[in-house]
């Protein structure tokens, strides 16, 4: 029952290991390797995260710098077009449009200095628009934004226009225009130099004009003269209505947004004296339609309100090669939809369409709204861009 005592000379029994000795012993190698590996991975991950963060900052700064370059390029492009453009013939209003404004007599209109010369070698009449002074103030601020439209009757379509001079009643133009006309035909022509006040949001008011029968001019030597402005006769023409829309271009995203806002005084197309108008918006490139959008139909109205936005992808290097065309049509449930009028904007369009486009480019990311007079559908087709 009791263990036998050890006999002399026999080996002593083994004693159990002491746990305190194990805790004080050496750590196994695999544990150290695991700890070192984990620490290394942690340090590597931290360094990698910091590296990626710095790379993102650099890329962000680079893209921001590129965006600034795009914005500056587009702004300069827009400014280069602004001074080259003037309103279309259809937008000129010979009568003052300010409320309560009376027709000014010739003593209040101002006067114009011009020059005439004929180049017998090239068969060209050279008309110089030098300056004007004492022009009538047609703006609310007591000033005007004058420019001069020059043409030879009976041809009203072949016009030249000076630049618009902002907020002045004494503009200095200093511009010369050439009309290729055989000398034997000049006697039957009448030179018209009409001074207008430019208005972005309405029709342009006629300040006055000078008419010079060419039969009364001796072109054997250059002529320079001052003439008092006369009241311009009102030209009757079919009114198709006006449309207001805004343009917004974001160069960094290559995004063009057209917002069709409203139209007014549209031509009556239905038997009942109204119309069911809607607007088609086309993006053209090289004279060909590449994208098409359209608004909703507004029933029984000549003054529709839309406020509908349409976006097109236009890369920055293509913005000079595209045009936007807006056509107002009358919806007909039973027959063919009939076009009321059309307007186009772009660098190859000219007139108010070019001015609106140039203002959009000069103010990237900002919507630029403007009223446009509708033109007959067969006369508003944009010119293909080069």
Curated annotation (Swiss-Prot):
TM regions (residue ranges): 25-45
GO terms, molecular function: calcium ion binding; calcium ion sensor activity; calcium-dependent phospholipid binding; clathrin binding; phosphatidylinositol-4,5-bisphosphate binding; phosphatidylserine binding; protein heterodimerization activity; SNARE binding
Mode of membrane association: Single-pass membrane protein
InterPro entries hit by this protein: C2_dom, C2_domain_sf, Synaptotagmin
Side Vesicular, residues: 1-24
Binding-site positions, Ca(2+) 4: 270, 276, 330, 332
Residues engaged in binding Ca(2+) 3: 199, 202, 205
A single GO cellular-component term on record: axon
SUPFAM superfamilies per the UniProt record, alphabetical: C2 domain (Calcium/lipid-binding domain, CaLB) (SSF49562)
Keywords of this entry: Calcium, Cytoplasmic vesicle, Endosome, Membrane, Metal-binding, Repeat, Synapse, Transmembrane, Transmembrane helix
CDD domains given in the database record: C2A_Synaptotagmin-1-5-6-9-10, C2B_Synaptotagmin-1
GO biological process: calcium-dependent activation of synaptic vesicle fusion; calcium-ion regulated exocytosis; regulation of calcium ion-dependent exocytosis; regulation of synaptic vesicle exocytosis; vesicle-mediated transport
Positions of the UniProt region annotated as Disordered: 1-21
Subcellular location: Cytoplasmic vesicle, Secretory vesicle, Synaptic vesicle membrane; Recycling endosome membrane
Segments on the Cytoplasmic face: 46-386
Domain C2 positions: 108-227, 239-372
Tissues in which the UniProt entry reports expression: Expressed in kidney, adipose tissue, lung and heart, as well as at higher levels in brain.
Family classification: Belongs to the synaptotagmin family.
Subunit annotation: Homodimer. Interacts with both alpha- and beta-tubulin.
Purpose: May be involved in Ca(2+)-dependent exocytosis of secretory vesicles through Ca(2+) and phospholipid binding to the C2 domain or may serve as Ca(2+) sensors in the process of vesicular trafficking and exocytosis. Regulates the Ca(2+)-dependent secretion of norepinephrine in PC12 cells. Required for export from the endocytic recycling compartment to the cell surface.
Protein name according to UniProt: Synaptotagmin-5
Lineage: Eukaryota, Metazoa, Chordata, Craniata, Vertebrata
